[in-house]
Amino acid sequence: AEVFLNDLSKVYRYLLRNNEDGMSTVRTEVQFIQSYFDLLKTRHGDALFLQMDIDKRYDDYLLPTLSLQMLVENAVKHNALSRNYPLHIEVFTTVGNKLVVNNNIQKRAQKAPSGEVGLKNIRMKYELLNQPGFQVMNDGKNFTAVLPLIWEKTMRNRPLHYSENKN
């Protein structure tokens, strides 16, 4: 219970401090998603797995705040999770300054209502930043989102500001 409350407080603190910020560092988002995932793991147990492979050279690159959380939440919302058929979520960096979030598709018996609000929100943030390259792909077996990572020096005089970890 103590570990759960600690993770819950980290998630809540991050949401309160960073929800208004437009951009966060990869380091900050990855730290947050680990705490968020720990909460999901408490609920879903062995029905959910997260694998992260983030190259440290991207730690100070930027991406829209809460993008990873929206994509992980999207994966959990739209897929069936069970111990026999676990949901696997991968988060990794790749050449060309990109962060990829990929999950296997396991359709729910009852489709969750969706207006694709999270995906539209991420797309809109990249458009506001005039940053091309956000992609979403669904091949029927995997759902993949590609997030362009932005070098801080290119963000000067942009409409959204960014946050470093404020914990």
Positions of predicted regions on the chain:
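Two-component histidine phosphotransfer core
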Residues: A1-P148, K153
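C-terminal end segment of the histidine kinase catalytic
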Residues: E152-N167
